[in-house]
Amino acid sequence: DDPTSTFTCPGGSNYK
């Protein structure tokens, strides 16, 4: 997962 193209939830998991 690319953190520049995803957003991070409060739990720290990345979503597309």
Curated annotation (Swiss-Prot):
It is found in: Secreted; Secreted, Cell wall. Signal peptide: none annotated. Keywords: Cell wall, Disulfide bond, Secreted. GO terms for cellular component: extracellular region. Belongs to the thaumatin family. This is Thaumatin-like protein 4.
